[in-house]
Amino acid sequence: MTAEQALPLGNGKAAEEARGSEALGGGGGGAAGTREARDKAVHERGHWNNKVEFVLSVAGEIIGLGNVWRFPYLCYKNGGGAFLIPYVVFFICCGIPVFFLETALGQFTSEGGITCWRRVCPLFEGIGYATQVIEAHLNVYYIIILAWAIFYLSNCFTTELPWATCGHEWNTEKCVEFQKLNFSNYSHVSLQNATSPVMEFWERRVLAISDGIEHIGNLRWELALCLLAAWTICYFCIWKGTKSTGKVVYVTATFPYIMLLILLIRGVTLPGASEGIKFYLYPDLSRLSDPQVWVDAGTQIFFSYAICLGCLTALGSYNNYNNNCYRDCIMLCCLNSGTSFVAGFAIFSVLGFMAYEQGVPIAEVAESGPGLAFIAYPKAVTMMPLSPLWATLFFMMLIFLGLDSQFVCVESLVTAVVDMYPKVFRRGYRRELLILALSIVSYFLGLVMLTEGGMYIFQLFDSYAASGMCLLFVAIFECVCIGWVYGSNRFYDNIEDMIGYRPLSLIKWCWKVVTPGICAGIFIFFLVKYKPLKYNNVYTYPAWGYGIGWLMALSSMLCIPLWIFIKLWKTEGTLPEKLQKLTVPSADLKMRGKLGASPRMVTVNDCEAKVKGDGTISAITEKETHF
């Protein structure tokens, strides 16, 4: 297109690949021609074949387990329908702005989660490292949930679910089937100390949980095999980059909706379903005065939108330059929140049925997180006719929901590494070997969470390594970097060059003021209200356990200030001169659309630069900084 002719560098990619091809394709004859063709294929970064692949990949990443097991419970816990008020506020002020920022940044720079920040503002390259550290932690522990789900699924192919009854080798004498309990016959049983078969299956059969993190115990080899299966599937979903990922998401991103629809129809037709839905949505406006309700709404937005992980930047970087990422982001954000809302009906209708069957208040059966997926819902399906069928559908839905979130995260980390060292990893099968190495290392690191004390380690990862506190910290710096240092007006020019028009000004002001202000407020609230983690609200970790948790949290957050300090220390000159140099975007970061191709004095990244005679744009001037 015209822009590419005027700006042959294409943000540095085309020129770099062309130089690599020329350098490696020397010599003559057929061998040289073959080598040149091979090098051209190796150095090609790749792109989505069509918009559908991008949309499904992003949808698969952001629509995950949190939509099913976290949002409905938070809605019920925080005032039902009243919770939607703070949720919508954060949806508009934080969710959409940061989601759009990361996607547009990836599309404009055509870079992964680290090098995109290096090109935009070298001083804030630490943002990229922070996101990838969080993602590396996430890749290790998130897939553990898939291993559990695969294990449960493998136990569904039977006439009677193993967690439906007592009498198995893993059950204790305290096991009581409550739905069959006759109080006159079981007067000698202390119901206060009794446990359900579904709880014993989870704690004694699946986890074989020890009494604390101090006692790691033996490896659960069955779960290790399930984890191996999960990593094998994940590897082959992404081993060819966008070529394989773009095809796999047609199944992994759409199948959960089919399962959710089936479970929704089944749920709302059960007795007691209406009571469950009532508890899910009945508004309690008095809860809005509780700051924790607003904090829960904000953190849920960050969790469910996969922001501050580098995933959206990586996925956006494979788009065509002129893709309308603004429209895509609005649509995907609405789809994500809509899915969470509908999932609440599917979950709470079943919980209402379970409360009805047991004759207890729904508050006693409502759960979130693993408690919902592996205790509450499995217990509910045992009360239904054809319970193995419904259990199979439920765990298949969980696996597909988690699978695409997992492999997209791994793909994003790989993209970040490959874009940092393109000449190393874009040759032969090195990219595939990199994915294999990351998968193997992550697999062995994850095995520690499949030991008898592994659940305690899993909770540390979940509460510290990829916590809302880390995401909020990164979001503050992302907004400051784009809104103030790089410049929101400059970034709006870049976006206009890509999509042909400027987005609503509200998003720009969110980047500059609203989003960082809200994130800072919630971050401070987190620190002030911090309470040490307890497993099941009972087990207290030893001091060194909390130390490990905080080290994992700081491992990502410290990347940003440490990188700023290192760059300032290594750069020569006075402090103003250092800031001047480190806040200027990369010289080859250019607009490739109509604005960038205009044969006149053009505005490139808010600075004036003259078009040279060869059609390229002169280097970025010193004016291109806000310092």
From Swiss-Prot:
Instruction: Point out residues bearing the modification Phosphoserine.
Output: 21
Which Gene Ontology molecular-function terms are recorded?
Answer: amino acid binding; amino acid:sodium symporter activity; gamma-aminobutyric acid:sodium:chloride symporter activity; monocarboxylic acid transmembrane transporter activity; taurine:sodium symporter activity
> Per the record's keyword annotation, is Membrane included, yes or no?
yes
**Which segments show compositional bias classed as Gly residues?**
23-32
Glycosylated residues in this chain: 182, 185, 193
- The segments annotated as topological domain Extracellular are 147-220
| UniProt entry keywords in alphabetical sequence | Cell membrane, Glycoprotein, Membrane, Neurotransmitter transport, Phosphoprotein, Symport, Transmembrane, Transmembrane helix, Transport
For biological process, the GO terms are: amino acid transport; monocarboxylic acid transport; neurotransmitter transport; neurotransmitter uptake; response to xenobiotic stimulus; sodium ion transmembrane transport
Membrane topology, as annotated? Multi-pass membrane protein
Q: What is reported on the regulation of this protein's activity?
A: GABA transport is inhibited by beta-alanine.
Task: Mark the transmembrane ranges.
Answer: 54-74, 82-101, 126-146, 221-239, 248-265, 301-318, 330-351, 384-403, 433-451, 468-488, 509-528, 548-566
Q: Which reaction does it catalyse?
A: 4-aminobutanoate(out) + chloride(out) + 2 Na(+)(out) = 4-aminobutanoate(in) + chloride(in) + 2 Na(+)(in); taurine(out) + chloride(out) + 2 Na(+)(out) = taurine(in) + chloride(in) + 2 Na(+)(in); beta-alanine(out) + chloride(out) + 2 Na(+)(out) = beta-alanine(in) + chloride(in) + 2 Na(+)(in); hypotaurine(out) + chloride(out) + 2 Na(+)(out) = hypotaurine(in) + chloride(in) + 2 Na(+)(in)
Instruction: Give compartment(s).
Output: Cell membrane
Name the source's superkingdom. Answer: Eukaryota
In which tissues or organs does this protein occur? Brain and retina. Expressed predominantly within neurons. Expressed in the hippocampus (at protein level).
Residue intervals annotated with topology Cytoplasmic:
1-53, 567-627
Q: Which GO terms describe its cellular component?
A: cell projection; GABA-ergic synapse; plasma membrane; postsynaptic membrane; presynaptic membrane; synapse
Pfam families, per the entry: SNF
Region named Disordered: 1-36
Which family is it part of?
Belongs to the sodium:neurotransmitter symporter (SNF) (TC 2.A.22) family. SLC6A11 subfamily.
Biological role: Mediates sodium- and chloride-dependent transport of gamma-aminobutyric acid (GABA). Can also mediate transport of beta-alanine and to a lower extent that of taurine and hypotaurine.
| Protein's recorded name | Sodium- and chloride-dependent GABA transporter 3
Q: Which organism is it from?
A: Rattus norvegicus
Q: What is the lineage of its organism?
A: Eukaryota, Metazoa, Chordata, Craniata, Vertebrata
